[in-house]
């Protein structure tokens, strides 16, 4: 019952933030007082922070909005282009606590339940990957520095205002309808905070995505648990249906089997973020692969920071 409510709430929230109807826009404006309080807290946090220099190059890839901006594939592209990175992230919805080394020089040390889905993408996508999950990024940075990191790549690190770093901010495509902070809009930080980014990454300008489907079948049903499934709209016409789950959702084999049966589908169409959680289920999966290439301008900027 709770899972079904969570799925419905996620669907409603996605519409509220990206495709609001009249009543949802009205609700957003009624919630403005709370958004103003939230914004004030964030601004105070930003300007009261004392930056610490860790004596190592740190590049943060973050965004101002709630998920779905393409940070993970961009981090993968950066790490592939510039070796020696230790990738550090929180490991959202993982079942482990504290600092955990997910991969060391390409050797995967944890399963996806302990690492979280995004950390496992890094571990499986990057040759000789070094990946750490930690609620406290400072502990992880010190560990990486001691273990030979050339530079640190912070996934979703913009909010760490007390860490001296080079901030890349990714602008989502599509962007939220209302440029307001939570709960009126999808912005975790005020839209004006783009001015604090050292580099603004925009898909189609600074980097480019190329997607294709591996193991395509005749009747695919799209099943995904990403923050903004509208980014997969180009694949909707190739599927017999679409089923969206909340971001980082923990699938069960039983519910996926039921979806296959109810749609009469021959395979599940999934992103890599979904696939790392279900690859051992023994179900037929068609995989959406994603490759990001960096513009020459972007490469020049990064080369100066590494």
Curated annotation (Swiss-Prot):
Binding positions (ATP): 65-72
GO MF assignments: ATP binding; tetraacyldisaccharide 4'-kinase activity
Gene Ontology cellular-component annotations: plasma membrane
Enzyme Commission number(s) of this protein: 2.7.1.130
Keywords of the record: ATP-binding, Kinase, Lipid A biosynthesis, Lipid biosynthesis, Lipid metabolism, Nucleotide-binding, Transferase
Entry-linked Pfam families: LpxK
InterPro entries found in the cross-reference section: LpxK
Pathway participation: Glycolipid biosynthesis; lipid IV(A) biosynthesis; lipid IV(A) from (3R)-3-hydroxytetradecanoyl-[acyl-carrier-protein] and UDP-N-acetyl-alpha-D-glucosamine: step 6/6
GO process annotations (BP): lipid A biosynthetic process; lipopolysaccharide core region biosynthetic process
Catalytic activity reported: a lipid A disaccharide + ATP = a lipid IVA + ADP + H(+)
Family: Belongs to the LpxK family.
Role: Transfers the gamma-phosphate of ATP to the 4'-position of a tetraacyldisaccharide 1-phosphate intermediate (termed DS-1-P) to form tetraacyldisaccharide 1,4'-bis-phosphate (lipid IVA).
Protein name in the entry: Tetraacyldisaccharide 4'-kinase
Organism, scientific name: Campylobacter concisus (strain 13826)
Lineage of origin: Bacteria, Pseudomonadati, Campylobacterota, Epsilonproteobacteria, Campylobacterales
Gene: lpxK
